[in-house]
Amino acid sequence: MPPRPRFDRRAPERELPNINERISYSSLRVVDSDGTQLGVISREDALEVAKERELDLVLVSEKATPPVCRIMNYGKFKFEQEKKAKEAKKKSHQTEVKEVKMRYKIDQHDYQVRISQATRFLKAGDKVKCTVIFRGREIQHTALAETLLKRMAKDLEEKAEVQQSPKREGRNMIMFLTPRKTPLLKKESEITEPKKALRTID
């Protein structure tokens, strides 16, 4: 029986950035850290200038002739690029409607599970459809279902705003929550006064 082929399970090496000594081109068009054109100079001279500035020589356009490098703080540049990428990803997030289903008679543990699910959806930037399902004659308990949904809205008020108040939809009662954009301002009556220190009796 022929031996089974062996697969290389090692993680692929990350592509290293073309900076400093990793740049292999002998001649480079160099832009200084302030945007000044230093012209076409040798790789060694470019590295020397970057070293004098206590900065990095970074290859920014490999396809140009000769390749273009810029003298910069690569660590700061990388941080700003990653920050921009995260912001772009956040803006490109398509808002979805996630649904949390429950019965009007729900125990505390299951209720907390639904709260956790809704919290996770809201943090991801999605809207939440809270649905109370009625079966058979349970439809007569719409008041209890409405109370449950209002309780959920109250428990999530720091993270969510009510987009649509509880209402009947067929044999269900629904409520829509959307991620809160502005911080919740507590009423003065909800702000607890600091506890007074207890007096000791000698």
Curated annotation (Swiss-Prot):
Primary subcellular site in the record, as a coarse category: cytoplasm
GO BP: ribosome disassembly
Keywords attached to this entry: Cytoplasm, Initiation factor, Protein biosynthesis
PROSITE patterns: IF3 (PS00938)
GO CC field: cytosol; membrane
Compartments in which it is found: Cytoplasm
Top-level lineage group: Bacteria
GO MF annotations in UniProt: ribosome binding; translation initiation factor activity
Role according to the record: IF-3 binds to the 30S ribosomal subunit and shifts the equilibrium between 70S ribosomes and their 50S and 30S subunits in favor of the free subunits, thus enhancing the availability of 30S subunits on which protein synthesis initiation begins.
Subunit and interaction comment: Monomer.
Similarity comment: family membership: Belongs to the IF-3 family.
Identification of the protein by name: Translation initiation factor IF-3
